[in-house]
């Protein structure tokens, strides 16, 4: 019996919606990254994108434990000399709450073309509204 290998044509992708309200950032991000990669499926193949589409709502209500709300710093660099920028978790949550979950999940995905394709299947929204009702997403309880 030959080992089954998934191909892009044979992969079936489902849509799931995740409510991040009151959830811990790292715990929700690991589950999302696992499902984006497709590791929860029996037909998982490392070199093929077998993951599902994930819609995250209420990203503005995600939590972190301890003093990380004030102490966690996100860094970015413009590419110019002295162009490093930093922003705390609290300020980023008030300004762009989607970016918190996106950065956490992106760091858990593979680096390269396959990881970028997996990341494109993540849709994050600050509030409860999303525009993917036509895909009939199933509720995923994490």
Curated annotation (Swiss-Prot):
Annotated organism of origin: Shewanella frigidimarina (strain NCIMB 400)
SUPFAM superfamilies per the UniProt record, alphabetical: Ribosomal protein L13
GO cellular component, one term: cytosolic large ribosomal subunit
Name of the protein in its database record: Large ribosomal subunit protein uL13
Superkingdom in the source lineage: Bacteria
Family: Belongs to the universal ribosomal protein uL13 family.
Subunit structure: Part of the 50S ribosomal subunit.
InterPro entries xref list: Ribosomal_uL13, Ribosomal_uL13_bac-type, Ribosomal_uL13_CS, Ribosomal_uL13_sf
Role summary: This protein is one of the early assembly proteins of the 50S ribosomal subunit, although it is not seen to bind rRNA by itself. It is important during the early stages of 50S assembly.
Any single biological process term in GO: translation
Gene Ontology terms, MF aspect: mRNA binding; structural constituent of ribosome
Pfam family membership, one: Ribosomal_L13
Keywords on record: Ribonucleoprotein, Ribosomal protein
């Amino acid at each position: 019996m030959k080992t089954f290998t998934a191909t892009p044509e044979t992969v079936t992708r489902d849509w799931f919606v995740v409510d991040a309200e009151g959830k811990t950032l790292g715990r929700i991000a690991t589950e999302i990254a696992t499902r984006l990669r497709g590791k929860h499926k029996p037909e998982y193949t490392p070199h093929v994108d077998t993951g599902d589409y994930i819609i995250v709502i209420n990203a503005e209500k995600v939590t972190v434990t301890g003093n990380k709300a004030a102490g966690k710093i996100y860094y970015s660099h413009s590419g110019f000399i002295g162009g490093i920028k930093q922003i705390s978790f609290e300020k980023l949550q008030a300004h762009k709450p989607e970016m918190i979950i996106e950065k956490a999940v992106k760091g858990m995905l593979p680096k390269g073309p396959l990881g970028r394709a997996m990341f494109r299947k993540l849709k994050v929204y600050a509030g409860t509204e999303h525009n993917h009702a036509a895909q009939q997403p199933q509720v995923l309880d994490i």
